[in-house]
Amino acid sequence: MQIQLPMFQNSRVVVVGDVMLDRYWYGATSRISPEAPVPVVKVEQLEDRPGGAANVALNIAALGSAAVILGVTGKDEAAQSLAARMESAGILADFQEHETLPTITKLRVISRHQQLIRMDFEESFAGVPQEQLEKKVAGQLAGAGALVLSDYGKGALRDPQAFIQLARSKQIPVLVDPKGSDFEKYRGATLITPNLSEFEAVVGHCTSEAELVQRGLKLVEELELEALLVTRSEQGMTLLRAGRSELHLPAQAKEVFDVTGAGDTVISVLAAALAAGSEMGQAVALANIAAGIVVGKLGTASVSAPELRRAVQQEQGAGRGAMTVEQLKVALDDARAHGEKIVFTNGCFDIIHAGHVGYLDQARKLGDRLVVAINSDASVSRLKGPARPINPLERRMAVLAGLEAVDWVTWYEDDTPERLLEILKPDILVKGGDYSKEQVVGWEIVEGYGGEVRALDFLDNCSTTAIVEKIRKDQVK
């Protein structure tokens, strides 16, 4: 399947469900408590992150889509923290505050990248009337491309049918991340996304692939769904639609570090992609790739559009690496259409050393994409002398293209990159070393079209020239 990334920035998604605050305490562990056989953690860092339905909204916003989050919280410090994080992420949050019940908070204590304990602070919101939340949702559906019901069984979605019927009456697709064994309450939804254990809790244990497909299709028919997506951990995910062949996608994760919030990522990417106009199979393929990214991160995390885009290109074996200027121009136009910021740097890069790697990592963090333009062999000889380059152009490009921080590598025949800057027009021009802006070649060009010029430090005591001289001296000895 050829996967296409949609224009996420053109979509708007409304999320309603059980919002939570994920709280992390990080610290060092070096001894066992004298009071009980448990480790003592010296807490060094505190962090709050949106969780539950709020994490779904955060994932949607990270992709570039407009996100709205609605749910029930307490009237407490945790609710204030959650609202502040929604605002800082550019998410419109409209919470129904309860006077006496607490905001659902999950506190995790982590040391040496391991979760030692989780403590939950919560009371069910099942007794809270839903009418106020329904009115809030109705007021936010105008212009929405999808509605997500993020059900964690905490009571905010006591009656999902009210939200499903409201959205479907406006021809807005409804995606449900379900909870519990009663899927009847999700009847009429566009898509539900149970994991395997949730699915089998409803249909019974499946002893074969054929049985899973058969029972899944029966569920699609009985609940009047358009589709059912069963997420199956290391076995990938399976999409089932009436009258269509099943679509099975293998798991993408190279290394599983933390599965916290992976289900949120799946439904977030699905909703944002469908809202942006993707076909269902395409949206599922994107969600599968995103899940593979997020389980490699620690804690409740999100996936950005550039991350997803790079992963798609790696999956399809295209879109990165060494390119001609003409090919690169097309790639940059496409990246800009997806709202990505382009960083550009240049140099000879004759012998790649630790200073180069650290510098390129810094440069990459300034934007979404990094272009490295290198001098041709003839250009290097003019600048460095007839004994250079040590490595020919093809080898220098191959090494740079293999670095994780580098998206694209190209070359130029001139002694300066000025003509290349006029063609590519990067957002940020970066140079390594202790330079003033006026000493960076091409700064007038970049600032002339509204770009930015930055100078970054190299790692101390790292120099290609010094390395070459040392090799020559060692040979003389």
Swiss-Prot record:
It comes from the Bacteria. GO terms for cellular component: cytosol. It is an enzyme of class 2 (transferase). Residues 344-477 are annotated as: Cytidylyltransferase. The active site is at D264. Keywords: ATP-binding, Carbohydrate metabolism, Kinase, Multifunctional enzyme, Nucleotide-binding, Nucleotidyltransferase, Transferase. One of its GO terms (molecular function) is heptose 7-phosphate kinase activity. Transmembrane segments: none annotated. Gene3D superfamilies: 3.40.1190.20, HUPs (3.40.50.620). Catalyzes the ADP transfer from ATP to D-glycero-beta-D-manno-heptose 1-phosphate, yielding ADP-D-glycero-beta-D-manno-heptose. Homodimer. This is Bifunctional protein HldE. The lineage of its organism: Bacteria, Pseudomonadati, Pseudomonadota, Gammaproteobacteria, Oceanospirillales. The gene is hldE.
